[in-house]
Amino acid sequence: MPSDVRSLLAGTRNIGIMAHIDAGKTTTTERILFYTGVNYKIGEVHEGGATMDWMEQEQERGITITSAATTCLWRDHTINIIDTPGHVDFTVEVERSLRVLDGAVAVFDAVAGVEPQSETVWKQADRYNVPRIAFVNKMDRVGAEFHRCVEMMIDRLDATPAVIQLPWGVEADFRGVIDLVRMKGLLWKTEDKGASYETVDIPRDHLEAAQEWRDKLLETVAENDDELMELYLEGEEPSTEQLVAALRRATLASKVNPVLCGSAFKNKGVQPMLDAVVDFLPNPLDIGATVGHAVGDEETEVRREPSEDEPFSALAFKIMSDPYVGKLTYIRVYSGKLTGGSPVLNSTKDRKERVGRILQMHANHREDREGVGAGQIVAVVGLKNTTTGDTLCDPNAPVILESMTFPAPVIHVAIEPKTKADQQKLGTAIQRLAEEDPTFQVRTDEETGQTIIAGMGELHLDVLVDRMRREFGVEANVGKPQVAYRETIRRKVEKVDYTHKKQTGGSGQYARVIINLEPSGGDGGGYEFENKVTGGRIPREYIPSVDAGCQEAMEFGVLAGYPLVDVKVTLLDGQFHDVDSSELAFKIAGSMAFKDAARKADPVLLEPLMAVEVTTPEDHMGDVIGDLNSRRGQIQAMEERGGSRIVRALVPLSEMFGYVGDLRSKTSGRASYSMQFDSYAEVPANVAKEIIAKARGE
């Protein structure tokens, strides 16, 4: 690889900024853009002016909904930042971003510590093995406790924090940070919005604590890095360079997480955090080869090195509609080069595509690029058939890269246009939005003919309906939210025999199948099909039809028509007719045998349970717990945090609609809550009876 390309890759960082809602993630990103010279005026989220939050709704709601990708420069390094949303309804955005990132900055709120969404995002990052550093933000706030936040990282996230900075002062007296790597104090000046800071000696009254924490830092890193361990055992004090190198190695191996602190809003601590991104987070070369598989053969591994000499390969991780250039596809290039106008293959769908323009994105401004190489994140225009998770590659060297997993929606509502004129526009709007967001699903209810949209939570669907109105001018009526129930079976039934025959002159239909049906023990969505037919009792070409028939029958359960999950079908035996058997006949037989078996297998209804965390003043604690119990909630834990009480519970989603209003009135607006999907569980018999009766229209 030419040295200039190598140094370009070594100087690239693809990072995400991840956190709980309100931990100050967007503000942190804004400061990064300001100090790296991209922005001339700092945007504030609470004023609705942040650059990264560029959809109108985000500015109104003060939360980040779509992960905008932005490029900036720091210390001669190119940093591509993906700002991810922290609200749990938008988990899919985080999941997508993590798939294409090399490293991440986890932002924590110094007052609240590690919150539920932080845990979710951290676990997602663990799954993709993303090295990360932590930034404890809001050190200027009343109740900020840096050390408690570090302890919570250990307890809740099972992390190994390597504390490399201590706060200098706290709350209103927060002045700067103490750098434990270089053993210096950093003080920020207020007159230039924190753009410069001075490095001073550590004041006397902080020296003892600084020394104690530096010893802890050396110990933590030495335990996770052999080279530093040798120095440590020999009693040698490592140089700054040696310590930085050891921290980098341990961070890249995901053994430690360097922890920094500051207050993005008060412009303190952002530049050292950028230094840490450059010093400790990986570049595309550190990540090494991307492993995919050959087209049509998942067993054959295909490797792509992060080099421009390799064939082109990239992953599309986000689709967005842009008012000026149409459909933008954000891609992460893993190998090779891409130039504007060149043909590429979408190997996931086996469709040829042509790339129009290549754009380097800054939250909502853009610059054209002639070409782009391995390790870069850009948006391209002109792709017609590509959706999230698809692989793009060189038509002469096809490969399919690992895609992403998206959770199934848990809530759905009926939507209908207000006027006939809106009908056409609604279809277009829904199609566009579904292209952008894989957790937003659309179907037509066959019985009522209504359009049903499904998503990850009430806020998620609110935002989508709002976008239809703003971006596509569609006025629509939205029904009450409905819960996505599921069905499953409790016991195994054997040798269910079904014969499908129709012989009324002309060519008839004939198929006989014998199946076993049993629970598969998965967690929602599982289906297995095993063929044990021997001796050609059913010709091989008809076996997939039986499978397809079973899968079709699963979509409408036998109790209340909800999808059936977690089952295993074993095809044991059957019969066919030389003339009258067909694929359709076996599909019908498979479907009917499945329904028959499901009725006998003790079917039950499942409902989504939400993990709910309520933060409340102590004097309202009894009301909150009583209310959760009345909603069929199971209290999991109670704890104290920063003068408030935290109640954690599992509550059925069906009981949580309108909770925000009830909670406000019960606690005079002093309590807050967050919730996220946890699991599916069996519905109690008395409740199930009502749901089934309602579904059957009784």
From Swiss-Prot:
Superkingdom of this protein's organism: Bacteria
CDD domains, sorted: EF-G, EFG_III, EFG_mtEFG1_IV, EFG_mtEFG_C, EFG_mtEFG_II
Ranges annotated as spanning the membrane: none
Residues holding GTP: 19-26, 83-87, 137-140
Any one annotated GO CC term: cytoplasm
Gene3D superfamilies: 3.30.230.10, 3.30.70.240, Elongation Factor G (Translational Gtpase), domain 3, P-loop containing nucleotide triphosphate hydrolases, Translation factors
GO molecular function, one term: GTP binding
Annotated NCBIfam families: EF-G, PRK12740.1-3, PRK12740.1-5, small_GTP
Stated role: Catalyzes the GTP-dependent ribosomal translocation step during translation elongation. During this step, the ribosome changes from the pre-translocational (PRE) to the post-translocational (POST) state as the newly formed A-site-bound peptidyl-tRNA and P-site-bound deacylated tRNA move to the P and E sites, respectively. Catalyzes the coordinated movement of the two tRNA molecules, the mRNA and conformational changes in the ribosome.
Family annotation (PANTHER family): RIBOSOME-RELEASING FACTOR 2, MITOCHONDRIAL, TRANSLATION ELONGATION FACTOR G-RELATED
Family: Belongs to the TRAFAC class translation factor GTPase superfamily. Classic translation factor GTPase family. EF-G/EF-2 subfamily.
Name assigned to this protein: Elongation factor G
Organism field: Frankia casuarinae (strain DSM 45818 / CECT 9043 / HFP020203 / CcI3)
Taxonomic classification: Bacteria, Bacillati, Actinomycetota, Actinomycetes, Frankiales
